[in-house]
Amino acid sequence: MNKGWLELESDPGLFTLLVEDFGVKGVQVEEIYDLQSKCPGPVYGFIFLFKWIEERRSRRKVSTLLDDTSVMEDEVVNNMFFAHQLIPNSCATHALLSVLLNCSGVHLGPTLSRIKEFTKGFSPESKGYAIGNAPELAKAHNSHARPEPRHLPEKQNGISAVRTMEAFHFVSYVPIKGRLFELDGLKVYPIDHGPWAEDEEWTDKARRVIMERIGLATAGEPYHDIRFNLMAVVPDRRLKYESKLHILKMNRQTVLEALQQLIRVTQPELIQAQKPTEGQSTEETKSAALKAPVSQESHRAHHGSHRNATDVGAEPPGALIRGPVMSAYSKPNSLAQNGGTVAAPASRLPAFLDNHNYAKSPMQEEEDLAAGVGRSRGVPPPAPDTDEEEEEETENVRRPLTPPGFKRRSSEPLPPPPGPEPGVLAEKLKETQRDLCSPLSIKTGAPTAPHSQPSPTPSNESTDTASEIGSAFNSPLRSPLRSANPTRPSSPVTLHLSKVLFGEEEPLLRLDCVRYNRAVRELGPHISTGILHLSKDGYLCPLSRLETGKVSPKGNKVEEPRESSEPDTERSRVTEVPQGEKFSPKELLALLKCVEAEISSSEACLREELEKRKKFKIDDQRRTHNYDEFICAFISMLAQEGMLASLVEQNISVRRRQGVSIGRLHKQRKPDRRKRSRPYKAKRQ
């Protein structure tokens, strides 16, 4: 039992992996570099490493020295987990167990739970024997130690082998029942440092005690002595960030629902204007695919009268409607009209935005298609009639027929070449279908309920999903209050959606932090710690502000408002509650951008923790790998090549010139200096 435990390094990655091997979940070990700063978050305990004093060593490992702070009451000592270190090199495991087995909110796992239950009420010595007789602990301990060398260096007579190397020791600082205890396995009793103040945490008192101890050991020198090291046992950061991300994503969904509900009440014309334009786009597609080319003058006159009759009454200012986007690709040879004259072709957009319908207005798309149909592509061969019929059937399935009361909007084709026209049309229709199926396309400004997929049939509401709108507000890693600052250009989706909602080019870049960040100030501190609640009338508040004392599980916190928000939309329109008094659309957009920034920051922190855990495992494998086989093979190869003897002689001569001791050769010189026998001198003469 007293043999076989190896020394462990003071490394947070090693201790973290050792905790996992013990079977403990949700715990990791971090290194503390600054004793002057407060420790963020909850801390289960501290593990302090210091250089062991030579004078305190003896054959009996447990020191019998007592002072005023030692706790000698058996009832107090036996009720906490304090064990004597009866096995050499086991202080690292003792320090970890002293922290873990004295915490109530840690998932210990089967091994440590069994040890804690079995040793309840035992004396410190009996607990030390229990640790030594647990093979699971010894196996986990040695699995993270460096391989022990096979041949130890020769010992010098009269000097203990322990004194030839520096020895370090681990102790624990743990809060137990409102008091700070120092648990040292090489002392008979635990040390009570007393309670901490009411206006401070136990970590503050522990830092003061450790700084005083370092100051006494270093005689007042600065507190950066390399002979000391401090590590903290804390909750697993990965679980923390995963839980935070879960809450943030639920709150993002709630904010999107609030924005959707608010837009339905304050801007119903966006939804009302969608019906005629959707039916109109279907007729435009059919007319472009079936009608033969006619004269330009008749189409111009018909198109001009139709735009004067429909556009003024149907299209709200600054709103983007789905109908023109659909018709743009179905009129390959149309011309833009302005008082009967042909408009000049508009300047081209960048290549990565040129083919996206959310990056340009409907009129610009018509002008682009009128300027060049087969631009940058060769003319495809004529398509058979069956392809046109299939495309027509696809469009009929995706869009219903126009109601009888609507007037068809005729296309304006130029006289095309007789051969390649059907092929170009089929290709444009395929592009239309691809754009409609794109998950990031935003054709209207009114978002719908979350988790809704784009429907092939039109409805009275928007077909954009909440996730699509949320993707428009991805922001870099910044603080919530800085998320509205113009530090980078907004995406085309964000700019266009803002223009649809507010009639401005870049309102998110012009947000007034005092005016539009009211939602961020009120709800910002709660977006990452609690669930936001959306009431039936569109008001947002944290669950802590609700009058109900009981909180439903996380899965039901947001689902209930989601189910009740849609049926109450019509009722909210009738009552016309002043939604802007609570949060305006711009304030909700600012809050949404704040949530997106927090999500990005949490995802980056989670990735960092995952990478750190991978590095811990890589370092542990490098530490525990046995390099003896490689070294022996390399030396054997040198000997076979005849290079080993010359290398040894060369290095010995270099070390002699530099005055470096080489073990036994240096030890044999000392008695030679004291020899004064005359035969020896005569022999030298």
UniProtKB/Swiss-Prot annotation:
Q: Report the function annotation for this chain.
A: Deubiquitinating enzyme that plays a key role in chromatin by mediating deubiquitination of histone H2A. Catalytic component of the PR-DUB complex, a complex that specifically mediates deubiquitination of histone H2A monoubiquitinated at 'Lys-119' (H2AK119ub1).
The residue ranges flagged as biased composition, category Polar residues, are 450-493
**Per the record, where is site Transition state stabilizer?**
Q85
Name it: Ubiquitin carboxyl-terminal hydrolase BAP1
Q: Name one GO biological process term.
A: protein deubiquitination
- State the organism named in the record: Xenopus tropicalis (Western clawed frog)
- UniProt main location, coarse: cytoplasm
Question: Which residues bear the site annotation Important for enzyme activity?
Answer: D184
Which stretches does UniProt call biased (Basic and acidic residues)? 556-574
Q: What is its EC number?
A: 3.4.19.12
Please give the residue ranges the record annotates as the region Disordered: 273-325, 363-425, 440-493, 550-579, 659-685
